[in-house]
C-alpha cells in the first residue's frame, strides 16, 4: 500500500488499556515507516471505566491531557447507555455516574469526540431512549455512533433470555428507536452520513468515511484486516 496516511485508528478490544508510552510508540512507528499528512485524524477507542480509572494515575492533571500531548486528537467512547439498569443488563464494567463523569472530563480537553449508544435493549421504552439521546446531546458531543443490541451466544445476556428472565430484543422496537434517533439527531444539526454514524459538519469520522469510499488501509494486530483496493 502506497500513499499518505490520513488517519490512525486505535480500535478494540480496548486500546485504552495501553500505557501512554505504548500508544506514543505506536504513533511514532507509523510516522517512522510511512508518509503521514499534516494533522492526521488519530482516534482512540476507550471505555468510560478505563478513562475514569486512568485519570486517577495520569502523568499530568488528566489522562485526557496526556492523550492530547502524545497526539490523540479524537476519542470514541463506548457509553452504550446512561441508565444503570441497561449497563448492568449488558454486563458493562462502567456505571451511569462514570459515563457522565468521563464525558464531563473529556469535553474539557477534546472537541472531536464520538460516543456509542445501543438501542433496542429489552425494557427500553421510546421515552427512555429519547432521554438517552438527550443526555448525549447535553454534553455537546459532535458525533454519535449507534447500533442495535445484538445477543451473542454464550453470554450472560443470552442466558437470561434463554431462561426467560428477560424478553428477547424485538426488531420492531429497534426500528422505532432508530427512527427516533434519526429524527432527534437531524433536528439537532447532525448529518446521517453513514449507516450507523451521525456527525455535525467537519466532525464526520475520516476513518469510517475511508472504508465507505473504498480507500486502502492497513490493519495491524490480532483479528485486524487490510484492504489494498
List the predicted regions and their residue ranges.
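C-terminal scaffold of the Radical SAM
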Residues: 1-229
Amino acid at each position: 500500500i502506497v500513499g499518505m496516511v490520513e488517519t490512525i485508528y486505535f480500535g478494540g478490544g480496548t486500546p485504552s488499556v495501553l500505557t501512554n508510552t505504548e500508544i506514543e510508540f505506536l504513533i511514532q512507528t507509523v510516522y517512522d515507516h510511512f508518509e503521514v499528512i499534516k494533522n492526521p485524524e488519530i482516534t482512540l477507542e476507550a471505555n468510560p471505566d478505563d478513562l475514569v480509572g486512568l485519570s486517577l494515575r495520569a502523568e499530568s492533571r488528566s489522562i485526557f491531557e496526556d492523550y492530547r500531548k502524545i497526539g490523540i486528537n479524537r476519542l470514541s467512547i463506548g457509553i452504550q447507555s446512561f441508565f444503570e439498569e441497561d449497563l448492568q443488563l449488558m454486563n458493562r464494567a462502567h456505571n451511569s455516574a462514570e459515563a457522565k463523569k468521563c464525558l464531563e472530563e473529556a469535553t474539557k480537553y477534546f472537541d472531536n469526540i464520538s460516543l456509542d449508544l445501543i438501542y433496542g435493549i429489552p425494557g427500553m421504552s421510546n421515552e427512555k431512549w429519547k432521554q438517552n439521546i438527550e443526555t448525549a446531546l447535553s454534553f455537546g458531543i459532535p458525533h454519535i455512533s449507534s447500533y442495535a443490541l445484538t445477543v451473542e451466544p454464550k453470554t450472560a445476556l443470552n442466558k437470561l433470555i434463554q431462561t426467560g428472565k428477560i424478553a428477547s430484543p424485538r426488531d420492531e422496537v429497534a426500528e422505532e428507536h432508530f427512527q427516533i434517533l434519526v429524527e432527534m439527531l437531524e433536528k439537532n444539526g447532525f448529518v446521517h452520513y453513514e449507516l450507523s454514524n451521525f456527525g455535525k459538519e467537519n466532525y464526520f469520522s475520516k476513518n469510517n468515511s475511508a472504508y465507505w469510499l473504498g480507500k486502502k488501509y492497513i490493519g495491524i494486530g490480532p483479528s485486524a484486516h487490510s484492504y489494498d483496493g
